[in-house]
Each structure stands twice: as C-alpha cells, then as structure tokens.
C-alpha cells in the first residue's frame, strides 16, 4: 500500500506540475445495467462544458472516463490508481456506488488529488478523507423529510425495504429514526441482496406484514423499475398499501415504462427534471442535447454538472496546479444557484446543503410523465453526519 501511494504522489508531481491541461478522471457505470446513470454523468459534464467552455483559469480541461459497470471496489481502486499514475489526473470524480468511493478515498492524500462525489450517497464517505467533497445527496438527507410526509398522511405502521449495502442501511436507519420521532412504528425492515430481481415474494411479505405503507430505497436502474412494477402488478396499490420512497425509485427515465399505474406515487428527492427555474431550463436543454435521448435525463446529471462547477472553482483557486488541500479549502462554504435550486458546500462536512422536494408522478400539459414538485424542504444538510 505504501509503495502504491508513493507512486501516486510521484506520478502526480511529475506529470501535472508543468501541464496547461487539467485532467479530470471520472469513474462510473458507462456500460451494463446501470449505464443510463453513467450516461447522465457524461451528459452533466458535457452540459457544463457546453455552457461554460472547456477552459478554466487559462487551463484546458480534459475529462477521462473509466467504466465500472456495477459496484466493484477493487476495480474502482485500480482504475483510480491508473488515472493518477498513468494519465496524470488532478481530480477524481463520479462514483455512482458507495463501495467504489470508499475504496478510492484512502488514496487521495498521498496522491494529492481531491475527489468530487457526483452520486454515491452513504453519509460516511466524506469522513474517509478530508479531500472528499460531495455534490450529490445522501440517503439521510432525502429520507428524513419523507418521515414527516408519511406522518402527516396519517400512516402509523410502515415496512421498510432497502438494498443491503451502505446507502440502503442509511435509508432504513434514517427513516426509522425520523418516523419514530413522529410517533410511527416500523413493523418490519427488509434488506434485499443487490442482485434481487424477483420482487413478487417481497410484495407478499409486505402484504402479510400488516403495514399501512412501505418505504423503499434501491439504487436507480433495473431494480427500481422492477420494484415499482411489482408494487402495481401484485395489487399493493389496489389493496391500499401506500408507497413512499426516495426519488431513486422513480427516475424520469423509468416513468414512460411505468405508465399510468405509477401516477400519484410520492417520493422525496433533491432534484426533478421538471424543476421550474431559468438555471434548470438551460441545464436540461444542454444535458438532453448531450444525451441524445431526452427521456434518459435523470438526477445523476445534475450531480455531475454541479461537480464540474465545484472543480472549476478548485482549479481557479490553485491556478491549475496540483494542490488538493488548497483546492478543497477553496470550496468550503461555496454557494451558488444550481439547476436543482440554491445549494452550498458545508464548510465542516464538505457535503452539499440543498432543498429536498416532495414529488408526485404526474403528467405535464403535453402528456409527458414527470416528477411534479409539491413541496419544498429548504436547506437540508445531512443528518447522517450528526455526531460523526
């Protein structure tokens, strides 16, 4: 390990010190079952470059992409080392899955490279290195407001269903903590293997639990589409079992497939493509153009777009030179108006503070399915970092 870290530091010093090109290495799922999210990373980055130009503080920007099709900490670590040693990147970014970000974080200080997390959502990631900054969200951040929504709906008994990995456990813990404070009861907590694709038995367990509603988190992709379809197909909606989830369950790219059966499903999330603001209109136009298929645009794109903004401020602060500590220090407390709304980087946690929205699947005036914003929970930090 020490040999690897020494090589990282030496490689960065020799390859980047004289460069007028600042290289950014982006690790994400650009093939395989989660490739739509990888495409959204790239679309968000391309949108930022299209609207702001590919030069910052006199330095040309070059983005290098590396593919991790599904959660693979070993591959992510290997690719990060390659990006720093071979390609000479000054910044690492992307990271769709928490285990991948966790695997790379220990390399950052010796390599003198900041990491900008554009999606991975376990609270603890930012505690693994002082050089981690997050522009996405956390499960605690998005799940906690939903407990208030559920309580106000008069629901007293809930079953939680999550994927069995870091973000899922965070979502389960956050919801349970908040819901019990509201006077509710979690009657059962189900943790599903990441590879789960048959949800009919899960739906039967939900029915048998006696819960009035379910709260769910799974990573956006084939699992979430399968879960929401199973909720409808197995009669839970008809039986009156209410559906509550984080927005990961209803990405815009899934809505046309889910169709009218999904109308009315409510989620809490930090972004909706339908968000009404000048900043979002410009972003959506540029990101959809970059994607090629407008229907695929989803939240990972805005995490990547804002990640590029943060990296640009780091480059300005360092003059394009490799100084990870100075780069991160420069963005602590940074605030701006994102396509998602007003945001800032918490100077203590280096996590993004942002609005969280209650959304409902609806149709717009043109008959397109959207996540319609109903309510705003302003300036949400990360409750999951309390006491850490």
What do the predicted segments below correspond to?
Residues 83-96, 116-118, 157-162, 210-220, ...:
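Periplasmic-binding protein-like
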Residues 36-41, 51, 55-126, 135, ...:
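Beta-alpha junction/loop-to-helix N-cap segments that form part of ligand/metal-binding clefts
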Residues 69, 77-78, 122-124, 128-234, ...:
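Extracellular/periplasmic Venus flytrap/periplasmic-binding protein
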Residues 25-44, 48, 66-74, 96-99, ...:
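Extracytoplasmic "Venus flytrap"
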Residues 228-305, 316-318, 322, 365, ...:
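Extracellular/periplasmic periplasmic-binding protein-like sensory domains
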């Amino acid at each position: 390990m020490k040999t690897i870290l020494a090589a990282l530091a030496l490689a960065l010093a020799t390859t980047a010190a004289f460069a007028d090109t600042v290289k950014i290495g982006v690790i994400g799922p650009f093939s395989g079952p989660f490739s739509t999210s990888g495409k959204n990373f790239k679309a968000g980055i391309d949108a930022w470059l299209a609207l702001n130009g590919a030069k910052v503080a006199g330095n040309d920007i070059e983005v290098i992409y590396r593919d991790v099709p599904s959660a693979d900490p070993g591959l992510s670590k290997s690719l990060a080392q390659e990006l720093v040693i071979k390609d000479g990147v000054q910044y690492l970014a992307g990271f769709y899955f928490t285990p991948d970000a966790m695997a790379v974080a220990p390399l950052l200080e010796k390599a003198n490279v900041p990491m900008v997390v554009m999606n991975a959502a376990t609270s603890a990631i930012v505690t693994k290195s002082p050089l981690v900054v997050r522009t996405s969200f956390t499960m605690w951040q998005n799940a906690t407001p939903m407990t208030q929504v559920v309580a106000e709906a008069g629901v007293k008994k809930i079953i939680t269903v999550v994927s069995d990995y870091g973000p899922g456990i965070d979502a389960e813990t956050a919801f349970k903590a908040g819901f019990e404070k509201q006077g509710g009861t979690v009657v059962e907590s189900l943790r599903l293997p990441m590879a789960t694709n048959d949800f009919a038995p899960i739906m039967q367990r939900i029915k048998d639990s006696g819960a009035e509603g379910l709260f769910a988190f799974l990573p956006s992709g084939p699992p979430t589409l399968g879960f929401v379809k199973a909720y409808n197909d197995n009669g839970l909606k008809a039986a009156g079992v209410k559906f509550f989830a984080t927005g990961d369950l209803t990405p815009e790219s899934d809505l046309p497939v889910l169709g009218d059966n999904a109308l009315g499903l409510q989620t809490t999330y930090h972004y909706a493509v339908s968000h009404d603001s000048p900043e979002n209109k410009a972003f959506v136009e540029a990101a959809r153009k970059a994607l090629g298929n407008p229907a695929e645009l989803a939240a990972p794109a805005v995490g990547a777009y804002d990640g590029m903004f943060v990296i640009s401020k780091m480059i300005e602060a360092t003059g394009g030179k490799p100084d990870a500590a100075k780069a991160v220090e420069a963005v602590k407390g940074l605030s701006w108006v994102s396509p998602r709304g007003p945001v800032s980087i918490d100077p203590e946690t280096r996590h993004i503070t942002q609005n969280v929205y209650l959304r409902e699947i609806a149709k717009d005036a043109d008959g397109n399915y959207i996540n319609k914003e109903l309510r705003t929970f302003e300036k949400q930090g990360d409750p999951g970092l309390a006491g850490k």
